[in-house]
Amino acid sequence: MPPISPHAVSTLSGEDGIPKYQIDLSLPPEERYLLLAKDFSTRMQEVVPLFDEVLETLVSSAILRRLLHFLARIFLWRLYSSEETRELKGIARAANIDLYYLVALNAALDGLLGCTSGGVVVKPSWGKEREERMMHFRTLDWGMDRLRGLVVVLEFVRSADDPGVVVARSVTYAGFLGVLTGVRENLSISLNFRGSHSCSTISLRFHQLLVLLGLQPPTATRLRTALLCPKPVLSLLTLATNLSNTKTSPCYIILCDSIETVIIQKDLTHGTKRCSNQFVACTNHDQYDERGADDGVKSNLYPKANLAGMEIVLEESEERYSCIRDKWTRYAQKKAGKQKTEWLAVGEKTLKNWIQEYPIMNECTNFVCLLDPKMGQIRWLERGWVVSDSDGDDGS
C-alpha cells in the first residue's frame, strides 16, 4: 500500500470532512493527481454510471446508446489543453477508469450546474485582517447525489519556486481539472450555469461539440488559466473584459478582488458586465434592466432556453435570487436609519446564515463556501444537506 500523504487532510471534522490535496504544478502533469486518483478510485468508478443515466434521458434506444459509447471511446481521448490531457491520463490510469468518461465529465460538467454566487461587503469575525472588505459567497448545486462524494479542496503549489507557498485554492470534484470555484490573492472566481442564450442555437451546439472533441477549451479551463497564471493578477476590469470577449458556452462568471465584484453574463462570443462594491448576486437566469425590457428587439437577441425543460430550473433560479436579494435589501433598509455612512457591511455570521437558508441552500447543494480574495483563502466551507429517502416519512 502507498504511504499516506501529508498533503491529504480534512478541512472539516467527522464523516463530513472534505479532503484537501496539494497539487504541485512543478511535477510532470501525469504525476500531479496520482494520490488523489488512488484515494478516490472507488468513488470515481461509482460515478461512471452517471454517463449512462444522462444518455438514457437523452437517447431512448439501447442500440443507439451502445453506438454512442463506441464513438465516445474513439473520439473522446483528449481535452483542448495538452497539459490537462496529460493530467487526465494520469488520473485515468491511477483510478482505473476509461479516459473517455473523464473527458466527458470535464467537457460537460460546467454546463449543468445550478449555483448561487455573488459578492458583499463583510465585517470579518476572526483573523489578522479585520478590515471590512468584499467577500465572495457561493453555493454549488447538482441533482445527482453521487457527485457529492467527489468534492475536494485543491491547494496548488510550485515546489520549484517555493513549496511552502500556496498560489491558489479550488473547491472542485475529484477528476475535474477546470475551475468552478477558486481563489488566489486578490482574485476569487466562480462559474454559474446560464439557462438561456441569445446566440444561434446551431452555433452554440457546434461550439459545444468542439469542446467535447477537445478542439475548443471548456469555460472552466479558461478560468483555471486565469487562476493559476504565474504572473501577477490582472486588474478586475481588464480580466472581466478579456473573459467577456472570449468564446465560451453561455454562462455567468463571477469575479471578486475584495474591493469590487463583477458578474459577466456570457453568451457565445460576447458578454455584459454588472459591477458593485457593496452587493451583487447571480443565480442561473438573466437580469434585465427596464431599458432593455421593451425595446421591441426580440428576434435573435431574445434569450432561448439551452435545454428542454429549462423552465423549472429558471423558476428555481429566480426564487434563489429573490431570496438573497431581499435579505440584502431588508438589511440595508434596517441599517439606513442607524448609520450615517452609505457604506454597509454584513456580519460574517449573518452572511453564513443567509446562504444556508432554503432555497439558496437546498437538497441539491453539494457545498457552500465563502471566499476571501484579500487573503487568497477559502474562509469557510461546508457540505450541502444530505436528504435521505426516509425524511418526512412517519410511517402513516
Task: Name the predicted role of every residue range.
Residues 1-123, 127-129, 221-396:
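C-terminus-biased signal that marks the final domain/tail of proteins
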Residues 54, 58-63, 79-220, 250:
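A contiguous strand-loop segment
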